[in-house]
Amino acid sequence: MARGVNKVILVGTCGQDPEVRYLPNGNAVTNLSLATSEQWTDKQSGQKVERTEWHRVSLFGKVAEIAGEYLRKGSQCYIEGKLQTREWEKDGIKRYTTEIIVDINGTMQLLGGRPQGQQQGGDPYNQGGGNYGGGQQQQYNQAPPRQQAQRPQQAPQRPAPQQPAPQPAADFDSFDDDIPF
């Protein structure tokens, strides 16, 4: 019998600069608020309606350090973690909070370019027109890369035939769609 799955995937916008702190053992912990929005058309009024949901995200370890260094208010990111509810008592009243935990099994990816007003520094993520990672998304997994066992080579492999260079895609300026993002 399966024990269940606890997995949360969010793509959203940071609502404030991340808060980084360090535990006594030296491990980093970063807390941030991530906003996700959904939009729909009200059937009665025909007006577009948008609802924003705020999520508490706590990152641990190396991914916490990276988030603290590169995420800022307005940054877009992809978060993959697990849902966790904490309970504590304050003034005799039980309180609860639910948050997304990104630990060794989680993932954080920086998306899009730098937020407006952020300084253009000399860091490695300031290449390719201001996009993080030179226009490509950077993924930060906590898990170390898997080592694959070396198989003995049975026969020399022939080089693959040369493929023709890819041609640029068609012009999509006239493409009109009703996608809400």
Curated annotation (Swiss-Prot):
Keyword check for DNA-binding: yes
Pfam families: SSB
Intervals of motif Important for interaction with partner proteins: 176-181
UniProt cross-references to PROSITE patterns, sorted A to Z: SSB
Single GO cellular component term: nucleoid
Annotated segments matching region Disordered: 111-181
Function, in words: Plays an important role in DNA replication, recombination and repair. Binds to ssDNA and to an array of partner proteins to recruit them to their sites of action during DNA metabolism.
Name assigned to this protein: Single-stranded DNA-binding protein
Gene name per UniProt: ssb
